[in-house]
Each structure stands twice: as structure tokens, then as C-alpha cells.
């Protein structure tokens, strides 16, 4: 079984943020900022605009930066994912 997003939605898996600051201070779970970098694990077929399906700009495997509070967090088969709209993705990291 897998997650298949609909429309212009994208499923991402967050990449872990640094756990130590530059000065060597270890950051606990509650103090950590939500990471904004993730890997795309599934892509919807694209939104329908004026009767035509739009092409998705991201693909599976892309590393992306996304809006800090975007999307819906879901747990699937023991893993945590975020489902968001393609518009919430700010950039592809190359």
C-alpha cells in the first residue's frame, strides 16, 4: 500500500534538522524549529485548470524547501509525512 496524492498535492518526508547549534549547544525536541527541507516521495497528477491538467514541477526524489507551516502531517505505516499543495513548495534544492 502507498500514498497517492490527488490533484496538485505532493507527499514529502522531512529531512532532519541539525540537532546542535554552531556554538555546540544541543537543541532538544521541543526547542527545535520545524524543518523546511524535505524529499518528495509522491506527486499527484496535477490540478485541472480550464479543463486541462497542469504539469507538476516537482518529481519523486527532489529535495525541496517549503513554507514553514504548510500542509497536513500524516502518519502512514509508522512513518511521518506531510501532504501539501505544490504552491507551498518554495524551491527545489539542486
Swiss-Prot record:
Record note on quaternary structure: Heptamer of 7 subunits arranged in a ring. Interacts with the chaperonin GroEL.
GO cellular component: cytoplasm
Cited PANTHER family: 10 KDA HEAT SHOCK PROTEIN, CO-CHAPERONIN GROES
GO molecular function: ATP binding; metal ion binding; protein folding chaperone; protein-folding chaperone binding; unfolded protein binding
Role according to the record: Together with the chaperonin GroEL, plays an essential role in assisting protein folding. The GroEL-GroES system forms a nano-cage that allows encapsulation of the non-native substrate proteins and provides a physical environment optimized to promote and accelerate protein folding. GroES binds to the apical surface of the GroEL ring, thereby capping the opening of the GroEL channel.
Protein name in UniProt: Co-chaperonin GroES
Entry keywords, A to Z: Chaperone, Cytoplasm
A matching Pfam family: Cpn10
Family that this chain belongs to: Belongs to the GroES chaperonin family.
Keyword match Chaperone: yes
PROSITE patterns reported for this sequence: CHAPERONINS_CPN10
Amino acid at each position: 500500500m502507498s500514498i497517492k496524492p490527488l490533484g496538485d498535492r505532493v507527499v514529502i518526508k522531512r529531512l532532519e534538522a541539525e540537532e546542535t547549534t554552531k556554538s555546540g549547544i544541543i537543541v532538544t525536541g521541543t526547542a527545535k524549529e520545524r524543518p523546511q527541507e524535505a524529499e518528495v516521495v509522491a506527486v499527484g497528477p496535477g490540478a485541472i485548470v480550464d479543463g486541462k491538467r497542469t504539469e507538476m514541477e516537482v518529481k519523486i526524489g527532489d529535495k525541496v524547501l517549503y513554507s514553514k507551516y504548510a500542509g497536513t502531517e500524516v502518519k502512514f505505516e509508522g512513518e511521518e509525512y506531510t501532504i501539501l499543495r505544490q504552491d507551498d513548495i518554495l524551491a527545489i534544492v539542486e
